[in-house]
Amino acid sequence: MASSVDMKAIRDAQRAEGPATILAIGTATPANCVYQADYPDYYFRITKSEHMVDLKEKFKRMCDKSMIRKRYMHITEEYLKQNPNMCAYMAPSLDVRQDLVVVEVPKLGKEAAMKAIKEWGHPKSKITHLIFCTTSGVDMPGADYQLTKLLGLRPSVKRFMMYQQGCFAGGTVLRLAKDLAENNKGARVLVVCSEITAVTFRGPNDTHLDSLVGQALFGDGAAAVIVGSDPDLTTERPLFEMVSAAQTILPDSEGAIDGHLREVGLTFHLLKDVPGLISKNIEKALTTAFSPLGINDWNSIFWIAHPGGPAILDQVELKLGLKEEKLRATRHVLSEYGNMSSACVLFIIDEMRKKSSENGAGTTGEGLEWGVLFGFGPGLTVETVVLHSVPTTVTVAV
């Protein structure tokens, strides 16, 4: 007997009507703040490397050029003194690192998530999906499970755990959240990125300067967003709509950024030409993303770019002829927090919407209608998310 079930009607009923929308943002950092001007002296002292005078001078120059004013780090001097293997360049220390991050990564994520949930203004029971992302450690059950317990989310919340993706993953989680929100009517997706550099901290080595670059750039932080389609405008306040999302591997970029989890922790390897590879390919990604909208003036859109380092931002700016203010929010987050891997772009979204409101810009995107979010990371992998801002004058009905 033929079925009378209308599968198209079932599928249509499962889908949202409108685009995925960012509804709330929260951020968090550890309490321990490290100022970049003081960091070279601290770093070489705590790693017992003060005899490496020339290398210390190189590191000072790296820190001076980093455009970073301060960073936040969970690991303190006292902790490193208790765990000296973490201060060597290549000493077995994975157990110690893991013991720390499997506890602290979910805790820092909880802090950011609670802020996002508070801003959203709805009970946690309305969260239907959880995406958790970290490059800091691996465990089973994962950080997604731990956060579910810490927040008291429903046992039936649909979880997705992303480990070891690196710096492009802030775009990846938004792409996944967009698909979940738009294909599950009524879904409210909690997205959390939490990063702690305890997995990558190590002492200096004069034959591996790429490792030293990481020590000058990386910081700790967590960020969370609530994503959903068809917001209830009486109780929810849209911040940005996600129009499209894409991922690509850049040509001829294999080995440009690698990370390997070993007994010594997570080791990073960076080629010098990472800024060149990104700047050479970025216009193609922009053209692909914005040609459907008829946009080809890159100064007419707002920018949220992962701040991998100042050289990347400088070369992208130069290649595209961007005005200095285009990367203001990105450079501000780099200056005040360093490179927090996957969490960075979410911090930048938060910075942009706050400054747009403070400055009376008219929209959440610095007064502009359309914008781009870029994530860059291992692969080289690039995530491109097209955003549509909303008027800053929109208020929640009471």
Curated annotation (Swiss-Prot):
PANTHER family from the xrefs?
A: CHALCONE SYNTHASE (PTHR11877:SF14), HYDROXYMETHYLGLUTARYL-COA SYNTHASE (PTHR11877)
Name of this protein: Chalcone synthase 1
Q: Per its UniProt record, what InterPro entries does this chain match?
A: Chalcone/stilbene_synt_C, Chalcone/stilbene_synt_N, Chalcone/stilbene_synthase_AS, Polyketide_synthase_type-III, Thiolase-like
Q: What is its EC number?
A: 2.3.1.74
Question: Record's family?
Answer: Belongs to the thiolase-like superfamily. Chalcone/stilbene synthases family.
**Keyword entries, A-Z:** Acyltransferase, Flavonoid biosynthesis, Transferase
Catalyses which reaction?
A: (E)-4-coumaroyl-CoA + 3 malonyl-CoA + 3 H(+) = 2',4,4',6'-tetrahydroxychalcone + 3 CO2 + 4 CoA
PROSITE patterns (UniProt xref): CHALCONE_SYNTH
Q: Does this UniProt record's set of keywords contain Iron-sulfur?
A: no
Whose protein is this, by species? Gerbera hybrida
An example GO biological process term is: polyketide biosynthetic process
Q: In which pathway does it act?
A: Secondary metabolite biosynthesis; flavonoid biosynthesis
Q: Which residues form the active site?
A: 167
Q: Name one GO molecular function term.
A: naringenin-chalcone synthase activity
Q: What class of enzyme is it?
A: transferase
Q: What does this protein do?
A: The primary product of this enzyme is 4,2',4',6'-tetrahydroxychalcone (also termed naringenin-chalcone or chalcone) which can under specific conditions spontaneously isomerize into naringenin.
